[in-house]
Swiss-Prot record:
Lineage: Bacteria, Pseudomonadati, Pseudomonadota, Betaproteobacteria, Neisseriales
Role, per record: Catalyzes the ATP-dependent 2-thiolation of cytidine in position 32 of tRNA, to form 2-thiocytidine (s(2)C32). The sulfur atoms are provided by the cysteine/cysteine desulfurase (IscS) system.
Basic and acidic residues bias locations: 276-286
The record's free-text note on cofactor binding: Binds 1 [4Fe-4S] cluster per subunit. The cluster is chelated by three Cys residues, the fourth Fe has a free coordination site that may bind a sulfur atom transferred from the persulfide of IscS.
Chain location of the short sequence motif PP-loop motif per the record: 43-48
Essential cofactor(s): Mg(2+); [4Fe-4S] cluster
Pathway: tRNA modification
Cell compartment(s), UniProt: Cytoplasm
Catalytic activity: cytidine(32) in tRNA + S-sulfanyl-L-cysteinyl-[cysteine desulfurase] + AH2 + ATP = 2-thiocytidine(32) in tRNA + L-cysteinyl-[cysteine desulfurase] + A + AMP + diphosphate + H(+)
Name used for this protein in its record: tRNA-cytidine(32) 2-sulfurtransferase
Subunit structure: Homodimer.
Gene3D superfamilies: HUPs (3.40.50.620)
Amino acid sequence: MSKKTKQELENNKLSKRLRHAVGDTINDFNMIEPGDKIMVCLSGGKDSYALLDILRRLQASAPIDFELVAVNLDQKQPGFPEEVLPTYLESIGVPYKIVEEDTYSTVKRVLDEGKTTCSLCSRLRRGILYRTAKELGCTKIALGHHRDDILATMFLNMFYGGKLKAMPPKLVSDNGEHIVIRPLAYVKEKDLIKYAELKQFPIIPCNLCGSQPNLQRQVIGDMLRDWDKRFPGRIESMFSALQNVVPSHLADTELFDFAGLERGQNLKHGGDLAFDSEKMPERFSDGSEEDESEIKIEPQKAERKVINILANKPKTCGP
């Protein structure tokens, strides 16, 4: 096999792996429904480019119809190349809206020199995006956070907030008016890096965030990447833990009735067994065969009509 053919095979495996991971996420959390108009938040980074690209490919073959509209918030950061995103979106034929709001000056004016800007910047950005989704009549807001972002958020909340809380794949917005989805929730960041290189997305660096190398999130990210190198499978096990929560073995009295616990009570996950040594699911293993398998970790959910986003559109017969 030639080097070129081998690379093409690897690229094809990567594309299939990402498509299946995103499709599984959408299916597991019922993220997209018939007739949805989805606002894809496009920052110019690798994650949001990949999100839009994969959703477009699913849209072309899915058994249901839904719309996509890309939205970019131009925060008026110095040196931001305003022409890059419109040129790219017009070249691929995706409807889009560029929202111009000078949040950069607001953040710089309000925060002291040297303070991290992410928290305030994020709050300002959310409000503008919620307003834009309403103006466009969108039913869902799609964000580009991936598996590693979700785990990093969990550790940030544990280390600095005293909460066992991560970043949900699907939620209701702060103002209660929108459904926010994260279709990349099952996707590894390292796969997104490879995909961005493969697709040659016109990446736009964030000068505001990128100029703050000592951010807590960056430190946590470095920790996770180090673990991934030194302890293969640890990241996969941690994400699996987010889908296998056992309230009776934690310490939150709001989640489990410890006060009403009685002898002989039949607990769903057992009583005194604190460590389970069962083999972890291999959805996120590094082997390509496992990545494309049918192994699933099903979240508990109410009965509903299941639509497989990975199924093909029904064929129509001619007259």
